[in-house]
Amino acid sequence: MATQVPVQSGAEKSNFTLNPDYGKMMEFGTNSAIVSAFIQMLFSSKNKFSFPMVFVMIRNMAVLLLVKTCLEDSKAFLDKFKLTNLNSLKFSWQRMMHKHLTYTIQHQSNGKWMYENTPISMTLLTPFFEQRQILIGRPDNYYYSYRTCLLKISITNERINIIFPDIQSVVQHVNNDIIHRNREIICGDRTVMYKVSIGNGAVPNLDPVAISKAYGTDIYLQLERSIRNYFFIDIVMKFQSIPFCINFNGEPGTGKTTFGSYIANKGIFDRIIIYNLVQSTNFDFKDNLNKIEMKIDQSTNKSKPMDGSEKVLIIFDEIDKWLESYIENKIHKMRDEARVTKQSNGGSAGGDKNTGTIIEGFQKLTPEEEQEKKNQLRFTFLDQLYNVVDGHTLKNNKKYVIIFNTNHFDNMFVGSPERFNALKDRFQKYEFKKLRKREIINYLNYVNDCFKNYDLTEEDKNILLSDTFDVDNLCVSNTNIYDDIPNDMVVSFRNLQKILRANHFNINRVVEHLSQIECSEIFTSDDIPS
């Protein structure tokens, strides 16, 4: 209630308000609001002062200042005990109701973070926690909700404790989303490899991938030398930072994607990202690339200097298939829109002239218009690809090498104007073909050497091998058996892998199988069914 004081003015009486303008106080929210209200009331033309009015005014201002001071001090006092955040009370109640588990991520003397025997990547874990307002660099107790439960994250300089209820869904969340997805798999003392998966809301996720052994084919060795020379020349000459763009073209199963595992073992790159674009046909190429770049920036180690020294390899798999699927997806949506009608029934039984049935339709595209739209989508993609190759899309804070895997590279340029002819020459191209006899023998020798040089532990022998099994049985007894492979033998790398698995990686049996492949009941020619 506003305090009003009657004031005698001649023969009439009038009331005026002594209280400050609370609206102004709420608007400013500072001591200046109180001072402003005091001055406004003091110099108001309607005010006529008397001793009662001054005393009431001083009393009201004193009460306001006292209440404000008490509230500020009490909030600061309660904040010290975290009583203003009820998560601590909720979590205490939750601990009484459920059994809880604790996972500890420990900082090691070598600078790594480990959960039991699993190395954890801080470059991945940091953005995961930051999305939940948890700061690893600021030790404290944090809480975040998962479904109906609270998880407590207790951070110190040496460890991160994750405390959560022993409920199956929550345990799976911690194991999969915190531990598994943020584990660090380092190869070549430096490289971490990820595979892109599309999560909820079409958001790409970087999932760590265990790096497998890969045989160094002639193309792999040649490209490795080119990449090393590219980075060396860039250091010496200080060229403008643009992506080194490469095209792997060839039939499926010829080893294009496997290059990621091969080069990861060399320790040239800091990160390798494999992205099969076919799983993301709702967005154009630029959107997909920007999302991946954002994920890379979010997961960058904040302690590393942003001097452009980080080397990143991105492998876009099946990009020509993605382009066709993307175009067909857009055309399909246009066809659906052409079939849409909207009806609105109104009016009374008597038939109101102002209401009735309204039908809104879309005119179907003619085949010529549909083809024109397909060409427009294709040319837009090629323009975006041109910008990537010219260095206008990605930031310059990293060294990028981008490999575009295709089955039919030229099909992406079908019907394109001459201005895109120069784009074809901007890629360093490698043609992948099926393995011939010499490559088959080289690969079988590589597998043979892997078995010979592997040091079996007692645990391996007890768990994986039987008493009658001998690793030497998998190896080649006499290299002359390779002469039995037909000279005109041609087989894809993927199909050769299938033959190896079907024969339990016994090299002698594999060679025997290859020598009789035409009369085999399991495989026909070099195209082996899945």
Curated annotation (Swiss-Prot):
As given in the record, the signal peptide range reads none
Coiled coil location: none
The UniProt GO MF terms for this protein read:
ATP binding; ATP hydrolysis activity
Q: Name one Pfam family in it.
A: AAA
What are the transmembrane regions?
none
> What's the protein name?
Uncharacterized protein L712
